[in-house]
Amino acid sequence: MLSAGRIVSTPSGSRLSRRDFLAVMSAAVSTACWREAPFDRRAFTPPARSAVGLFAAASYSADLADIIFRGFRELGVNVAGRRVFLKPNMVEYEPGTAINTHPAVVAGAIAACRRGGAAEVVVGEGPGHRRDIEYLLSSTGLYDYLREERVRFVDLNHDDVKVMPTKSWFTSLRDIALPVSLLQSDFIITMPKLKTHHWAGMTCSMKNLFGVVPGAVYGWPKNLLHMRGVFESILDLTATIQPHLTIVDAITAMEGDGPIMGKPRPLGFVAIGSDLPAVDATCARVIGLDPVKVPYLPPASRYLGNIDTRRIDQRAESPDRFATRFELIPSLEHLRLTDR
């Protein structure tokens, strides 16, 4: 079995050697018995209270750098001297849809981090559907901005990986191969697009972490994670990676048959917070879902954060300002809040 901490090279455009591939797979499919608790309690200090900021942004032409930087100040986010890693949600090629995190939000986050004194800002994604990363970048409009601003982009599907022990055990995985570029950063920001999801109910800060694990190891669209359970994998990834912040693109979200075939739905805000379950629970309530019914959120509230409104301090705008009854596919109707 591949020992935790070993770095395996997966250069872009090539495959793992058979030996390294089998070693990584051996770690990935380990079926060791669950420990006493599903979380490594030593790795977590659950917050007593959490702050979630909803910042109005009527369109993508708004000054998103200023909006996000204001969020940093209101929430006490400090990136000074940090190596910041931004992980947007990039799925399909079609620009102008509600599938991807909008390039303007990514650009705004880069500018806000630089204004906050970040030592370096890197952007990375490991798309599960489309493997031509250069075309994906150019077609989404992000390539030109990154080139002009000299921001490095990392294809996480083919980055070198380091096998890390998981910090929760909802799946049978006891180790996860994570990109070295992500691990070398010291401030990780997940940047999802708020969407419904036909399997997970919704995709937001936590589900976005599926794009961190390399397709060169876990397949497309990250099949080895799906096989072990979508909800369970969301929890294990969040517990193990532990991002420092989330910036949610909810300026235009997606309802219906998300995360790809749904319809755009303008909401007009950016959500920011360091407690991922709290941010996801807040976004769920905005679109009319009950966080207690979204399967991965109640377990997450045990160690990773808060989902109870009594423990969440809302900053900037009230969620009621953006509250919307999202269209859902029939299999997700049971997730609705009873009062909407």
Predicted regions and their residues:
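N-terminal and secondary-structure boundary signal
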Residues: 2-340
